Each structure stands twice: as C-alpha cells, then as structure tokens.
C-alpha cells in the first residue's frame, strides 16, 4: 500500500513528514534542510524556483518572487508574471510539488496521498482552496486537518490514557490560532478554537522594516519604500534581526550600499535594535493574541487552572515576549519545551495520515468547525444552523418558509461568521430553489440542511417538502476555481514539471560534457608535454583534438542531442587514446626487461596514488 505524507503548508516555511515503522519522521529537502521556505520565484530564463533557491535570489528578482501567499489563499488575489495570472492555489501547489518530490526522493517511491494542515480559523473558502492546491500538485488530499489539532495529536499521543486538557498556542508566519483540546485513551477532541488569519511573524517583520525606514529617512532624508530592491533587503534583514533578538538583547542591522544620494554617492544603513525597543514597537500585535485566548477559555467553559499542558506551535512563538505572555495568560504555567514548534504540525499530519491509512490504530480525531454557519433570513438576519466549535463531521437541518404570498422560488445565501446581521459575515455562496407551487406566505416548507465533512468543507441542500424538489451547493465560491480550471492548472503544473525535469537533464548532460572535455584536454596536454614525448602517435592525439573541438562547438549551442552525440564521439576517441597508451606501455615494459619494467611500473604507480589523494582532498575542500 502506497504511503501517505503529512504536510504543514505554512506561510513562511513548510514541512513534510512520513511514518517510518510507525514513527513520524520529518523529511529533509533536497537542500538538506528540514523546513522549506514557502517562496516561489519565476526566473528570467523560464525556470521556476521553489524554497531556499527562490528565497536566495529574491533581492535581485523582487517582482517575480512570491512569498507568504497563504495569506491570500481563498481570495480572488492573483499575480501576473509574463502575461499569465497565477492564483494562490497555483503558487501553493508549487511548494507542495517540491515537498512531494523531496518525500519521493527520501522514500524511493511515488507519493499520491497526503494530509495537509490549515489554521484552525480558516474559513470554508480557504480550506477548499488549500485542497485545490493539493490537487493541482498531483496529490490526493485525504484530509484537511487543523494545525493545532495536528500539534496536539503529535504531542499527546504518547502521554498515556489519563485524560488531559491541552492548550495549543499557534503563532506562525501569517496566521494565529489558539485551541483547547481534550486528549485521553486515544481520543483527541477539540473543545474550542479561535484565532486571527492575518496575524503572524510577517507582521513583526513589517514593524522592524517600518522602524528602519523611519530611521533611515530621519538621517538621510531618503524614503526607501520607493526602492523595491532596498525594501526586499530590509525585509530579509528584519527577519534575521527578529530571530537574533529571540536569543540576544540587541542586534546590529548593517546594510551597505542600500541606496545612493542625489550625487550618486552610496549610502549605508547601520542601526542597533534592542529587544526592549522591538517589543515596544510590536506590543499591539502581541495584545491581539489575548482576545482569541479569552474566547477559547470562555467557549470551552473551563477555567485557566484546568489546563494541564501548554504547547507552543509556530516559529514566532520563539520570541521571548510571546512565551512570556502565554505564561502570564495561563496563570504562570510553563509552556512545554518538548516539541519543535516548526515541525510538530507536520508530525501530527503524518500521524493522521497513518490513522487514515490504517497504520496507526485506536486513535480518533474529533475536530470542530471554527465559525458558525447559517443562512440569511427575512430582515437580513443571520440564522445559524451550526454553531461554532461544533464537532465535525456533522449534519443539521432546519425548516423555513416563504416570506411573500405565491413566492415561486427562494434564494439561499450561505454565510460563515458570528455577527447577527448576515451581510457582516463571510458570504460563502448562494443558490436558488425554484418551482415552489403558489401558496400563501408561511405555508411552503423549505428544509435547509448543512453537512460539514471531516475536512471542514460545507455542503448545503434546500428541499421543498411539498414537491420533493431540491438543490445542492458544495461551497467553493471562495476558492473561485471550477473543476475545469483545476484540471487546467494540474496540466500546467505537470507541463512545468516536465520542463523542469528536461532543464535538469540538459544541465546534467552539459556538465558531463564539460567535465569530459576538460579531463580529456588535460590528458592530451600531459601526453604532449611528457618527458621523452608522447607514447602514442600524433595522429591519434589529433583525432582526440578534433573530437574535443566538436564537443566545444556543441556546448556553445543549445542542441542537447548534438552535445550528447559529440560527447559519445569524444568518449570513443578518449577510450582509443587510453587503449593506445596502455598498449605502448606494455610494449615498453616488454622491450625494457623485467628490472627496468618493474622500476618504471612502481614509480608510475606511486605517482598515481599521490595524484588520487590530492584530487580527493581537493574535492572535499570544495
């Protein structure tokens, strides 16, 4: 049975994990790191870069590098590059494709099934869009799981059968969630969840950038916000400074040649940022985490003292001010230090994948819907059918009637949110039930059913009890992608994957050819410069020279078939040269007699050993 992976598709970084012998293992990417930057870049030569390579070139390719796209998923945002619009789903799919490739390389087998995590406070549109991204990447998304739930699963599965209350405080690169869960006897049940989908480490970075811009403007009079390349350098420096301030009391931010003045003289940015100043300029961001925390405690109906464990998730929780605030809000409870905040979500996703595949037994995951769901009724009121923090999957029905006499149809508008007025909530979608027989208002019986699956994705049905007519909508308005569009994007992604594969193959062929040319050229030169002259006739060397010239000419062009052909020809000629040298050496030894032959052979052998060692050492240094 093919294995399934667990993927934490993050705003800043993403992680993939898999079960090995029943235990979750975080898979290192092709660059050797356990986390992959969620960055996608479109190079000028048509190559699509993902992860660290994309992040590395961001300064010189600002307009064609996309980061933190998770903040836009489930919206109609898009970016135009080379005349083509890319949706958040397509950009996210690039990151997922890289994680998929890295997992396949690690396991040595194809991967098709995956569990992907999302912030607990993601609405239906964002969940559907994440699932679409997985589909575009060639993955069968077994389940969409809430990040705090996955973290609790990873943390609590080995904590015995005693029931425990766990608070998960998840502050990532772009989103914030806080969830309260009960864990015991293999059951992970979410009691309540809340959050903010636009609060994360990126916001802390932005505050440092703003601080640097103000400081630089104050000393030089130049506004760096008008310089895209300078702003990208500031963002990277801000992220680095934020990380350093997690372990140091102050950090130096030094950016030479950040811009030039009116006389084209280079200007430098050199500032010292202290942890206290950093905390001062970001205090309001920190305070925004208080309300969701209080909401979760209230919704779960418990006191802070009943929390057994506090688990911090997301790289942003490494900031001392964050862990101190959590400690304060939980009545002095020390957050658990036994989990890696960057990896625990992917580990939990891998465990859930194992549950769905039957590899992990006796585990039941009971998640909740983060926001209430309902329809708009007369007067623009939001009538809730499913309250927030209801365990999913779930199904609820309620009967409504018409507002006017002889009303032939009803418009069902589906909303998600907590406001009493429907228009103040998030409109997920709408559909119409037609063919209602003429009748006075209040007589027709329209049954509306909400069905939420285990992924948190909503299906709504409206049925006229009198006629049996019904209409159903699967909410995907927020994702904005039809099946045809998803299919097209899958084909595009596959085409790009083929292009990338072809480009890699071409690079490999070119590298092999260049290496063969260099080694053969060097060998021929050594033969001509050898004491006593070459051991082989000049016409043999001339043939090799010609093959080298042909290979160089092919390398100057773009025809890979020509390079392969020239490389094969050069390989044949260099083999013939090697054979000729071997035969000449044997003939010399036979003519020179045993003692002389042995002496010459020993000397050559010694030289060969020394050369080999030097080459190996040199390669290691590289």
UniProtKB/Swiss-Prot annotation:
Annotated TM spans: none
Task performed by this protein: Acts as a chaperone.
Annotated stretches, region: Disordered: 494-513, 587-622
Compositional bias segments (type: Basic and acidic residues): 494-511
The name this protein goes by in its record: Chaperone protein DnaK
GO molecular function: ATP binding; ATP-dependent protein folding chaperone; unfolded protein binding
Species classification: Bacteria, Bacillati, Actinomycetota, Actinomycetes, Mycobacteriales
Compositionally biased tracts (Acidic residues): 608-622
CDD domains membership: ASKHA_NBD_HSP70_DnaK-like
NCBIfam families, A to Z: PRK00290.1, prok_dnaK
InterPro entries recorded: ATPase_NBD, Chaperone_DnaK, Heat_shock_70_CS, HSP70_C_sf, HSP70_peptide-bd_sf, Hsp_70_fam
HAMAP family in the record: DnaK
Gene3D superfamilies reported in the protein's UniProt record: 1.20.1270.10, 3.30.420.40, Actin, Chain A, domain 4, Substrate Binding Domain Of DNAk, Chain A, domain 1
Keyword Repeat: no
Modification Phosphothreonine, positions: 175
Induction: By stress conditions e.g. heat shock.
Keywords, alphabetical: ATP-binding, Chaperone, Nucleotide-binding, Phosphoprotein, Stress response
Family per record: Belongs to the heat shock protein 70 family.
